[in-house]
Amino acid sequence: MMWSDIDASLPAKKIEVLGPPPTSGTRDAFVELVMEAGAEEIESLAKLAKEDKKAFKAVFGSMREDGAFVEAGENDNLIVQKLEANPDAFGIFGYSFLEENQDKIKGASVNGVQPSFEAIASGEYAVSRSLFVYAKKAHIGVIPGMQEFMDEFVSEKAMGEDGYLPAKGLIPLPAEELSKVRDAVKNGTGVSM
């Protein structure tokens, strides 16, 4: 299938999308943020979503099986290599791999917004998701190291602007939200944003 088969204004080039397997959280996020959101924009599918949520999910959650979508496994380095070999292909993987390989590949803009640290942190780049960490309150003080782990995870050293988690690709919360999370960890309460 060619891009021009979808829209005549698109180039007559073969569609090739390299992505993760069904077991991947990145794929789950892509299905939810891109495929489901896109399906909701199609009138007949929006109607189906209201009438039969299970059927709607079966439609938007299915990847093509005609060769346009290629499961490239969990190895993001392999996807980068394949993108270098075929500059017309698209790859689905986390921002940290784009950032590490920006000399070889470029990110896709979504609604006119390029993927960047700032655009992801602000929520402006639509194809990004938050990372949630859950701890049972009943485990704090019972499971050795649980409170210490939570304290460390939200510490300035770990999650601060110059912390080791952002150095590994994590986009930290904006300061105000991070402060709320730190208070929740300290007080043993939940936080919703």
Provide a role label for each language-model segment.
Residues 1-193:
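Flexible loop/hinge segments at secondary-structure junctions
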